[in-house]
Design a protein with these regions (language model features):
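N-terminal helicase ATP-binding lobe
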Residues: 1-200
């Protein structure tokens, strides 16, 4: 379950922070993470996280998601990114902190010849505590009328959905996408975090 990931996450985080605790950047990252942990106690709904580049947004948003999931018994975390290059990078960070089995990548760069049948099925159903996927895959799971795309829709209920670099959504899709995430928050028990990085 998602709450089983909290101890491994903090074990690895303390190890990483102990090496950087005296640097100004290390102190800033720790403060941002602690602010996110405090926000995780607030009731499910919409949240925003704007952090300067290099400020630890990825791990801070994950700390929020894990703590919020535990506090409100949410079932999984979806980390939604606009580009496959940063998906692979973020998934590698998550695996380093949570282990390989806890993280599911789902995007177009995955090689179906390398993936096992179990991995393909997990990707089709989003059957994992932490799913890292593209905006395209995420919104297709909501809007598509194909059974294969809709198969993972039920996995969105009672989840923390982190929309990283949310401002990259094309303007012409903004209204329906915002309506969809409002629906997820209002009627599916989701929490949505809109993340962006500001330039330092």
């Amino acid at each position: 379950t998602i709450t089983d990931l909290i101890d491994p996450f903090y074990c690895k985080l303390l190890e990483v922070e102990s090496r950087a605790q005296t640097t100004p950047l290390g102190k800033l990252r720790r403060q941002i993470r602690q602010d996110c942990e405090q926000a995780a106690e607030m009731p499910p709904g919409f949240f925003s996280l704007t952090v300067p580049t290099g400020g630890g947004k990825t791990l801070s948003s994950l700390a929020f998601a894990l703590n919020h999931s535990r506090r409100f018994q949410l079932r999984r975390v979806l980390y939604v990114l606009p580009f496959t290059t940063i998906i692979e990078q973020n998934a590698a960070v998550f695996r380093r902190f949570l282990g390989n089995d806890a993280v599911l990548e789902h995007h177009s760069n995955l090689d179906p010849n390398v993936e096992t049948q179990a991995a393909r099925l997990a990707a089709e159903n989003w059957d994992s505590p932490l799913i890292v996927t593209t905006s395209v895959q995420f919104y297709e799971s909501i809007f598509a009328s194909r059974p294969a795309a809709c198969r993972k829709l039920h996995r969105l209920a009672r989840s923390v959905i982190i929309l990283d670099e949310a401002q990259t959504l094309p303007v012409e899709y903004l209204a329906p996408c915002l309506q969809a995430i409002k629906e997820l928050v209002n009627n599916y028990g989701c929490t949505v975090v809109l993340c962006t990085a500001t330039q330092p």
